[in-house]
């Protein structure tokens, strides 16, 4: 989910950063028994713990035949040992609707793409502010951190791989959104109907389904005119999955007319460049410059005209915090000037947008979604409808982005007046669709990457992209 750059935003170093989610080390230390150190009896002892010398005094050794018989019995006992239970307990259905907890018996989910850092992290002297941030990261760390992320990523992969098979000209955008969101809720085993259930796991933000010159932040809304996918459309699919607030944000673009292939190739290559350059202590301005260089080395031929692919200037990649899709760091797709660096423990959504238009996105009419500003004061609220709506939002979404569809799914009615009051007071912020000039085409690819101490894990990587 792209982070729009404010009009008055100056790209530069941040004075301070918020705490970031922590990450586990790659190979945690094993217990002695698990590592095989306590596999058998100590030297000089029998398996019963008795000293061998006590048994040998004044006694003859057992015959060779007796020893052989004993060995055979032991071998038989070894063969009868029960096999370990496999990790997978069953297969996924089509469409995917079986909760992952029913497939992965031990609740451990697969690793994604592990990439070693190209240079050793030899910067051992840290400034005080960075040490403080690192302590905040450690305090936020728990044993389930990495497993939560891997579960969310596995849900994303399974859902999107099915959705890609049904995404064809003639399908309605509302049907695609429902398939994605129903799949996510089924696989996380959290339907989000009971109060607070959506905060445990589920959708991290509304499904983005943006066509052609619509760059980002469009989703079907109740009562709106149905939009049908056409053969000549360029469709961007952007959705997020969270488990306990650990958000995986990933997006891809589909086109059926091969004339758009070079556009998609350019944006995918630019995103992979950003992932390659990302790492601990990586300078964000260097990453941005590399992304733009790759993106704008491509051209696309449309209507017998050669059009350069341009990197969109006013939307960026971003770091991700717990229960917050947009953190305090941005990764532009164009050359910029900043001293900001990536840090150990950061989680980034590395995404790029390429356009055949002016490569600048403006707000369009309509509303994509909302999010609640946790720091805004509700002291000035007087309407009971606004107060009731705010409680519903906090109880069910917290700081996660939500849409009108999500409110109506909870059975909330007549919320428009209350929502206008919350938005006018600055308690709730709204997202508008972002568009390039009519007649242009925008493509997007995105992955979430975890900057672990000794490697980076592209957590959302799959066989598809």
From Swiss-Prot:
Cofactors named for this entry: Co(2+); Zn(2+); Mn(2+); Fe(2+)
GO biological process, one term: proteolysis
Region of interest called Disordered, as start-end residue ranges on this chain: 1-92
Record field: compositional bias (Acidic residues): 44-55
Pfam families registered for this protein in UniProt: Peptidase_M24
TM regions (residue ranges): none
Enzyme class: hydrolase
Residues at which a divalent metal cation 1 binds: 238, 249, 446
Cofactor binding: number and manner: Binds 2 divalent metal cations per subunit. Has a high-affinity and a low affinity metal-binding site. The true nature of the physiological cofactor is under debate. The enzyme is active with cobalt, zinc, manganese or divalent iron ions. Most likely, methionine aminopeptidases function as mononuclear Fe(2+)-metalloproteases under physiological conditions, and the catalytically relevant metal-binding site has been assigned to the histidine-containing high-affinity site.
Compositional bias (Basic and acidic residues): 1-13
Feature: compositional bias, Basic residues: 71-86
GO molecular function list: initiator methionyl aminopeptidase activity; metal ion binding; metalloaminopeptidase activity
Subcellular location, record wording: Cytoplasm
Keywords: Aminopeptidase, Cytoplasm, Hydrolase, Metal-binding, Protease
Homology family: Belongs to the peptidase M24A family. Methionine aminopeptidase eukaryotic type 2 subfamily.
PANTHER family per UniProt: METHIONINE AMINOPEPTIDASE 2, METHIONINE AMINOPEPTIDASE 2-2
Cited function: Cotranslationally removes the N-terminal methionine from nascent proteins. The N-terminal methionine is often cleaved when the second residue in the primary sequence is small and uncharged (Met-Ala-, Cys, Gly, Pro, Ser, Thr, or Val).
Stated name of the protein: Methionine aminopeptidase 2-2
Species of provenance: Blastomyces gilchristii (strain SLH14081)
